[in-house]
Amino acid sequence: MKLEIKNLSFAYRDHPVLQDINFDTRPGELLSVLGPNGVGKSTLFRCILGILRDYQGEILLDGREARGIAQREMASMIAYIPQSHRPTFGYTVQDTVLMGVTHRLSPFAAPRAEHVRQAREAMARVGVQDMADRSFAHLSGGEPQLVLVARALCQQSRILVMDEPTSSLDFGNQLRVLACVRGLTQEGYTVLLSTHNPQHALTFSHRILALHDGGVAALGDAGDTLTPELIWQLYQVEVDFVDTQQGRVIVPHRGGSL
């Protein structure tokens, strides 16, 4: 499944947010979207997901314009993993994951045995199979986010869109969730992920897309594209890049422009 964004622009009434955005995604890659608050990362995702449709330009899925694709079919192509999920009712983890098959069911139909099997396989792939009967509302740490990833896998979409998935997690759970997501790219999944943490983008991404002033500031391989100059342009923070045995680390300056 290939996603192509061509000359995408979007405005809220008279307020332009995105202007002439161009990029594509590749199967088996994690593409991180970076940029300051309010730059349009979430708006970009809402356009891609079909929530916002009054954009200019093209959003193509395997060559088809997204606005011409019905929501049920769109759900078979792209899965959305939000920052958080607060269920209205006391659904179990397995119930939550099974919601990923909704677009494949007729109205009022219940999930069948094959759907339960798919849900259990999805839970096992992200390591939450032992939580199947627990209440989703009682999960903690990175567990809810991993369950939402499992739900997306159960949806059987090949493109996963994640809007700041680790923003509310502690350090350890941030790394666990991102390592899990990066691992999915080895199975051919495409992951489009927004983050405010350049280190996460550098460590886990194949490529980065940097947005600034409504447009594309940079696009390319994470190791080559993410530089001190780009971080200054995006966040007005001075940093150094330090090479370690575990990879390159971004170190902010203690004084000066912080």
Where are these regions (language model features)?
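The feature captures the beta-strand-to-loop junction immediately N-terminal to the Walker
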Residues: 34-36
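Helix-to-loop junction immediately C-terminal to a conserved catalytic motif
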Residues: 49
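Conserved ABC transporter NBD signature motif
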Residues: 57-65, 74
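Conserved ABC ATPase "signature" region
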Residues: 98, 113-131, 156
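Conserved ABC ATPase signature
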Residues: 135-139, 143
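Catalytic Walker B motif of ABC-type/P-loop ATPase nucleotide-binding domains
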Residues: 160-164
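ABC ATPase nucleotide-binding domains
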Residues: 234-258
